Amino acid sequence: PMQAHTNPWYLVLSSYWFASSFKWFLILLVLLPARVAELVPEAERATRLGLLFALGAVMALIGPPIWGYISDRVGRRMPFLVLGAVLTAGALLWMAYAGSYWQLVVAYLLLQIADDMATGPYSALIPDLTARRERGVASGWLGTLQVGGQVTAGAVGFLLANLQWQFLLIALLNLVAAGMVLSLIREVPGLKPQRRELWESLLAPWRSADFRWVWLTRFLVMLAQYMVQTYLQYYLADVVETFQAFGQTLATEAFQAVALLGLLISLGAAVSAVPAGRLSDQHGRKPIIYVAGVGLAVLMLPILLLPRYDVLIVLALVFGLLYGAYLAVDWALVSDVLPNPQAHATDMGIWQTSIVLPQVLAGSFGAMLDVFNRQSPGLGYTVLFLIAGMCFVLGTILVRQIRSAR
């Protein structure tokens, strides 16, 4: 095993998060839409894709807490990572070569189950293995690797035209990352198996007021983030319209323009995550969350008032820096307030729902957007981004209520 708690150790500890976010970025953005388009008539495309997304979202809500619970019951993490990673690779190959839409559905559901099996227990490793004074750094590395996975996936999606090769690459990366974690990280020896029943375990963390506040604040910030992210491409197409900066035309289509902004946000986040985590170990979690959250809220105004692509490029970078700091410190914050050391995987699985639920809910703002845009062009985006700004502010201010972290 590696020397614990050096930078390389943190890097390997979170390497499966790199593989996981690489996988989901390509699957949700590129591969699922493309495979559905190959397998169903054009008129049914959006409906069939929506069905897949909905099924996946429901499973992503219930899967991690349940696999986390099983992992806590057994008192082990790594066996789930191994089995989950192997099944993930199998499901990806099946998705790549599925001959019908329903085969694709089953393969995708298998992928969800396999992913939850691996990442539910895996998410307990930071609270399991790191002391409170180093969780900021550990979470910072996690944030950097998650974002790095997205950047790498974006590059691969851009450069590698063959869809089957993309699936194979994701499968390979999953196995390599799981192998790294397995060979170089030792899980907590003799973790006492959890004895509570499933319902009792799923309800237990909610009895802690701090856990409720951590869940709610994360939920609000993520809801704001996904409200912006989900409709940004349409905002670029409808309001910004031309994509010039520094005398150059950088993109001709809105989807290229949004990909570039996404890349800049990710780069900003990758830069800020580890330093922010380190600062939070020294000076406390809350000050950094206050700065990042208020900053994200304030950014909503220039996005609305100056709808020019060159301005958005700069704002995307700033957004990324703040968002990376928030992500890093938030994971450390929840690790600090988990009530029961024997239930880390269950509790982290429940906390993860505060990230999945906003993704699902963000889709429901589309109708409101259309209604307001019909009244006056662009009005919908103003309303949407202002609501997002309010969620950023609320999700930041309410962190004050968390008592057991500073």
Model-derived features with residue positions:
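Glycine-rich segments within core transmembrane alpha-helices of 12-TM secondary carriers
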Residues: 56-61, 136-158, 352-363
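Central cavity-lining transmembrane alpha-helices of secondary-active solute carriers
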Residues: 50-69, 260-275
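C-terminal ends and interior cores of transmembrane alpha-helices
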Residues: 83-99, 294-307
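Multi-pass alpha-helical transporter architecture, strongest
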Residues: 96, 176-186, 386-406
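Juxtamembrane intracellular "pre-TM" segments in multi-pass secondary transporters
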Residues: 1-7, 187-216, 242
